[in-house]
């Protein structure tokens, strides 16, 4: 009897062994089958059926195993804990010692020019100093005289961020990824460029800084050639790579990214200063989700005094990026839904667009979503294009308020465009054609140069970008407006009339004048056919809009012509009578509220009693 049991035991062992070998063979075939199934959808159902068979077989093996006598041949294995599933990093949080900066800042002179981020001040100027200051403004469009006298390694004073930012801790698992900092420059002032570099070295944890890559976009200033190369050798992790031909920001950043070795790319402009703890919150968010593109809270370094606008602990009004229908980037306060979502300043801000100058992104994700459009030239539009692409293709744009970086905002660019400023319109046409679907017509009505390029197909080949959109299975632009930026007012896709409003009595066009965001009087000006200040739309809601950037409406309150923010903003709103206009068959424009008509008097637009026989009340969209 005992012998029979032993024979049965041997048979069972053979059966278990055979079943296990067969199981391993099928499992190996299953792996290759799954790889094919991801590429061939018709195989997915077969793989699913195979999964069911494997489950049954595995169950049979387990049943045979469990029916066998149990032999205690080793000590019980300890229960695996959650922490042991990831042996590559330690539990808990990074300590301040672990996050020590790459370089400690040298002792500071509290009375030095611009110390602790304070403004540079000077009361008396010699003729030579005045000349130097003026030349600095002319060359760099900021006060290079002041910058040159402020320490390259100046401190920015105590950490004034909100307490929850100062006290924020960062988990070791998943570990914070290291970053390559990429800084593009073209004829940048020596002091602002090097202060940016030192700022990174003095505020970035050594374990997180892989390298700083300075990308020279064909600078012509001699001090940025061999002297710069010689200087940065002492900075250990800093290298210079160069474009021999001026190609602009986009290709320069692509060059920097191509040589970067870290997991994360961090792009900065060449006139920045980083505040306490600026990098860790950016990297922590990417460690959580590599499809998030993160920007710091960008504060102002005054272009005249180089005063650093420090963060405040309470009461800051946060902003996010937006765009208008001329595809210009801008800022706006957070909508109520975003304010309610955030519990404190450690919460990211969801942003429809980003400024594009300062941000961090996973290198692998940067490559996955198509880096930059390398057929865009110099700069202009690349940030809006990337904003649309990230959101529409499954990623997110966020601003991290606890990360603070200062930036010198200039009122104009000191650099020329080798191919003229037409490159901006060309870049914008490329992004409109790839990402905006039918909504691109709203943009083309506001930019006649871009519309002409689109008609003439003079914006280059976009086939690769269209293939990228298809390959990534990206959402359409309607989805972006509905889900990412529902606050965006969408003008009529096909307004009743649009263009310039020409007065037939004086042969001039209605014009809003310079920098008129409402409240300033309108004017009549020679018709120039360029849109801009002379662009108007008569909508299906019967309001008359100047909406290149903001949605501004003509109104005739108390018989006076004016311009103000439109009352009709979509759902749950309507056009008030003083913003409602009627275009008559006699070419009059009558206001529904006052009953008066738009007329020209002394070459100024005013409201007057309607008179169909007066040519100064005859208007035509051209």
Curated annotation (Swiss-Prot):
Its EC number is 2.4.1.41. UDP-N-acetyl-alpha-D-galactosamine binds at residues 511, 514, 528, 533. Residues 176-285 are annotated as: Catalytic subdomain A. Disulfide bonds join 509-527, 553-566, 597-610. Mn(2+) binds at residues 269, 271, 407. It catalyses: L-seryl-[protein] + UDP-N-acetyl-alpha-D-galactosamine = a 3-O-[N-acetyl-alpha-D-galactosaminyl]-L-seryl-[protein] + UDP + H(+); L-threonyl-[protein] + UDP-N-acetyl-alpha-D-galactosamine = a 3-O-[N-acetyl-alpha-D-galactosaminyl]-L-threonyl-[protein] + UDP + H(+). It is found in: Golgi apparatus membrane. The keyword Chloroplast does not apply. Pfam families: Glycos_transf_2 (PF00535), Ricin_B_lectin (PF00652). Pathway: Protein modification; protein glycosylation. Catalyzes the initial reaction in O-linked oligosaccharide biosynthesis, the transfer of an N-acetyl-D-galactosamine residue to a serine or threonine residue on the protein receptor. May participate in synthesis of oncofetal fibronectin. Has activity toward MUC1A, MUC2, EA2 and fibronectin peptides. This is Polypeptide N-acetylgalactosaminyltransferase 6. The gene is GALNT6.
């Amino acid at each position: 009897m005992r012998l029979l049991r032993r024979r049965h035991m041997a048979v069972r062992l053979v059966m278990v062994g055979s079943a296990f070998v067969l199981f391993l063979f099928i499992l190996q075939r299953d792996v290759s089958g799954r790889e094919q199934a991801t590429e061939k959808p018709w195989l997915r159902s077969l793989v699913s059926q195979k999964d069911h068979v494997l489950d049954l077989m595995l169950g049979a093996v387990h049943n045979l195993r469990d029916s066998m006598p149990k032999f205690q041949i080793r000590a019980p294995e300890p229960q695996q804990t959650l922490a042991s599933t990831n042996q590559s990093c330690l539990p808990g949080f990074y300590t301040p010692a672990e996050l020590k900066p790459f370089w400690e800042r040298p002792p500071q002179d509290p009375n030095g020019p611009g110390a602790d981020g304070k403004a540079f001040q000077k009361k008396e100027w010699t003729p030579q100093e005045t000349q130097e200051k003026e030349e600095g403004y002319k060359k760099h469009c900021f006060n290079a005289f002041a910058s040159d006298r402020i320490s390259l390694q100046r401190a920015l004073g105590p950490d004034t961020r909100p307490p929850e930012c100062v006290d924020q801790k960062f988990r070791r698992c998943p570990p914070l990824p290291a970053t390559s900092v990429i800084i593009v420059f073209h004829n940048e002032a020596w002091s602002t460029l090097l202060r940016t570099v030192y700022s990174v070295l003095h505020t970035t944890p050594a374990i997180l800084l892989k390298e700083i890559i300075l990308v020279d976009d064909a600078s012509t200033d001699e001090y940025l050639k061999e002297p710069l190369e010689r200087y940065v050798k002492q900075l250990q992790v800093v290298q210079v790579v160069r474009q021999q031909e001026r190609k602009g920001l986009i290709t320069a950043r692509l060059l920097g990214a191509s040589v970067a070795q870290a997991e994360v790319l961090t792009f900065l402009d060449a006139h920045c200063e980083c505040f306490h703890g600026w990098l860790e919150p950016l990297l922590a968010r990417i460690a959580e989700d590599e499809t998030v593109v993160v920007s710091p809270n960008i504060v102002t370094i005054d272009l005249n005094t180089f005063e650093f606008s420090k963060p405040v602990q309470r009461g800051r009004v946060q902003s996010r990026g937006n765009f208008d229908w001329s595809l210009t980037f801008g800022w706006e306060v957070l909508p109520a839904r975003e304010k309610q979502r955030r519990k404190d300043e450690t919460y990211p801000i969801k942003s429809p667009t980003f400024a594009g100058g300062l941000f961090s992104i996973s290198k692998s994700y940067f490559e996955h979503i198509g880096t930059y459009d390398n057929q865009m030239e110099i700069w202009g539009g690349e940030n809006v294009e990337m904003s649309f692409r990230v959101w529409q293709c499954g990623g997110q744009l966020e601003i991290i308020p606890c990360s603070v970086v200062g930036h010198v905002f200039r009122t104009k660019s000191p650099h020329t465009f080798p191919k003229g400023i037409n490159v901006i319109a060309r870049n914008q046409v490329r992004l409109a054609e790839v990402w905006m679907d039918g909504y691109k017509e709203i943009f083309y009505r506001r930019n006649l140069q871009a519309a002409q390029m689109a008609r003439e197909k003079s914006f280059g080949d976009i086939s690769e970008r269209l293939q990228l959109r298809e390959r990534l299975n990206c959402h359409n632009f309607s989805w972006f407006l509905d889900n990412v930026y529902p606050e965006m007012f969408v003008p009529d896709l096909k307004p009743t009339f649009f263009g310039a409003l020409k007065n037939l009595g004086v042969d001039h066009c209605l014009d809003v004048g310079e920098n008129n965001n409402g409240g300033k009087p309108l004017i009549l000006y020679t018709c120039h056919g360029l849109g801009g200040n002379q662009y108007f739309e008569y909508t299906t809601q019967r309001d008359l809009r100047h909406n290149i950037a903001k949605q501004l409406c003509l109104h005739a309150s108390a018989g006076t012509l004016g311009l103000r923010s439109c009352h009709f903003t979509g759902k749950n709103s309507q056009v008030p009578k003083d913003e409602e206009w009627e275009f008559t068959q006699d070419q009059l424009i009558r206001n529904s509220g006052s009953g008066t008509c738009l007329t020209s008097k002394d070459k100024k637009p005013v409201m007057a009693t309607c008179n169909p026989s007066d040519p100064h009340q005859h208007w035509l969209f051209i």
